């Protein structure tokens, strides 16, 4: 009887020691949050592992996101997908459709170009009109766009940048929230785990890949809603818009393209007998085909221009955004208690299994110690 009690006591004692040891080890991952000192000597294991390596963890997560999750190549692929093209073209269509509700007349447009429409009745319409347009183009093709267009029009264009920012953020959220986005994040995370270092391996002891991928997906979606991210995107778009305004006319519209557009306008004008009346009526009534042309042809060209321009300058955009630093700074702003609760919430089941395993292993070791004690 004494022998059995000894073995049982050793099992219980070993289980308690093993379980409590694992509980303390888990707590020491997070606690204490700051170092403690006795006189001038720092107490070992203070602060805890995660508080001590917090900046390194944030840096690694930022590196993962920038180099393997939100990459330039991935963004280029998404921009060139048919769905993205359709969304951009719909946005342009929406802006062009506003012309249908404006009272812009041909006379106003011709006046902006320095053309007296009434003179066209007395002169050879074709020669006069085309020569005038060609002269205007030759006179202005080396001038900046900001020097040619009215300030009110430039301000209106600039006012659309916030809508583009919202559109880009919304598209990013839609992708990250989709099954495809979730699968891409998991696959890239899995590849990274197979290639990269120790800190990620340490995290994987307490969190499954699915949990990490889910958390990254959640944080990326939240990042697209963060005001600072939207400010950065808006600033980049504003900078690119300023660059675009500073381009010469011939960089935007080639001479042959300008001639084609001029001929199109001329053909429309020739279809009307009462030219003066027609030129003073709104474009939406006079030349509805022109609006249709803008919707069908120009919108496609503008869509291609936006996608090609964005893809061309994507490297500079990503450098200006500095996604790695943005993520790192965001994680470093998290309260340590919040990080602890976050990890425990995600890996709660696994942590409980570790503590249970400590009790079991401690009990097994206690059993063998009891058996050895009997024979000693």
From Swiss-Prot:
Q: Which GO terms describe its cellular component?
A: plasma membrane
Q: Which UniProt keywords apply?
A: Cell membrane, Membrane, Transmembrane, Transmembrane helix
In terms of InterPro entries, this protein maps to: DUF445, UCP032178
Q: Would the keyword Ribonucleoprotein be found if you checked this record's keyword annotation?
A: no
Q: Which residues form the signal peptide?
A: none
Top-level taxon of the source organism: Bacteria
The membrane spanning regions, by residue number, are 4-24, 356-376
Q: How does it sit in the membrane?
A: Multi-pass membrane protein
Q: What is its main location?
A: membrane
Q: Where in the cell is it found?
A: Cell membrane
Give the family, as the similarity comment puts it.
Belongs to the UPF0754 family.
PANTHER family recorded: UPF0754 MEMBRANE PROTEIN YHEB
What's the protein here called? UPF0754 membrane protein SE_1527
UniProt source species: Staphylococcus epidermidis (strain ATCC 12228 / FDA PCI 1200)
From the broadest rank down, the organism's phylogenetic lineage runs: Bacteria, Bacillati, Bacillota, Bacilli, Bacillales
